[in-house]
């Protein structure tokens, strides 16, 4: 399990006084209201205190206390913001962080190894796990539904699925 979780990616500056545009990597951009600070993924010792933020067109405009000019803000471009896992919102039962799903081995209910999760597609209605197949050339697309995903064990690194017609084609 990862010790830090990504919550946003800085994609540009905003204005001249050090604000930045952040693509939120959380389900709710309002999540930032609960955070006093974030860290830079590539420099965990650099703490950025959130002075204020606002959401505009699914982008978060954020001001950090430590950044006061456009030149300083430019140095943050294309960097990821993270928080410590223990500061993350508690997830409902049977809900997982994407970073914990990626890398899981996928087995059918008979114990046959089918593949490994390499990405998660967020469709709106339900997530879809994209798995590198061990049994064919095409990736497996596994809907993240209780009828299909029967067990997820993050600690042991696997999930078990019920294979439905067409899933392995």
From Swiss-Prot:
GO terms for biological process: ribosomal small subunit biogenesis; rRNA processing. Pfam families: PRC, RimM. InterPro entries: PRC-brl_dom, PRC_barrel-like_sf, RimM, RimM_N, RimM_N_sf, Transl_B-barrel_sf. One of its GO terms (molecular function) is ribosome binding. One of its GO terms (cellular component) is ribosome. It comes from the Bacteria. It is found in: Cytoplasm. Gene3D superfamilies: PRC-barrel domain (2.30.30.240), RimM (2.40.30.60). Keywords: Chaperone, Cytoplasm, Ribosome biogenesis, rRNA processing. Residues 93-167 form the PRC barrel domain. Binds ribosomal protein uS19. An accessory protein needed during the final step in the assembly of 30S ribosomal subunit, possibly for assembly of the head region. Essential for efficient processing of 16S rRNA. May be needed both before and after RbfA during the maturation of 16S rRNA. It has affinity for free ribosomal 30S subunits but not for 70S ribosomes. Belongs to the RimM family. The PRC barrel domain binds ribosomal protein uS19. This is Ribosome maturation factor RimM. It comes from Caldicellulosiruptor saccharolyticus (strain ATCC 43494 / DSM 8903 / Tp8T 6331). The gene is rimM.
